[in-house]
Structure formats: structure tokens, C-alpha cells
Amino acid sequence: WLGCARVKEACGPWEWPCCSGLKCDGSECHPQ
């Protein structure tokens, strides 16, 4: 398990992917 980015945490090419059920909206993860 490699971890994941939660709501309002950074996401993108050099960050963790968003947790399940979240989407990357620009630079932060948000609920879908």
C-alpha cells in the first residue's frame, strides 16, 4: 500500500494519487 491523497491534499504527477472516491481538481483532491 503506497498511500493516497485525501480531500484538499495535493495531487498531480509528482504527488500521491487521490484516495478512492476522490478526483484531482487541478492541484487538490476533491469528492467526485
From Swiss-Prot:
GO terms for cellular component: extracellular region. The keyword Disulfide bond applies. It is found in: Secreted. Expressed by the venom gland. The keyword NAD does not apply. One of its GO terms (molecular function) is toxin activity. It comes from the Eukaryota. Keywords: Disulfide bond, Knottin, Neurotoxin, Secreted, Toxin. Disulfide bonds join C4-C19, C11-C24, C18-C29. Its main location: secreted. Belongs to the neurotoxin 14 (magi-1) family. The presence of a 'disulfide through disulfide knot' structurally defines this protein as a knottin. Is both paralytic and lethal, when injected into lepidopteran larvae. Is a slower acting toxin, being lethal at 24 hours, but not paralytic at 1 hour post-injection. This is U3-cyrtautoxin-As1a. It comes from Apomastus schlingeri. The lineage of its organism: Eukaryota, Metazoa, Ecdysozoa, Arthropoda, Chelicerata.
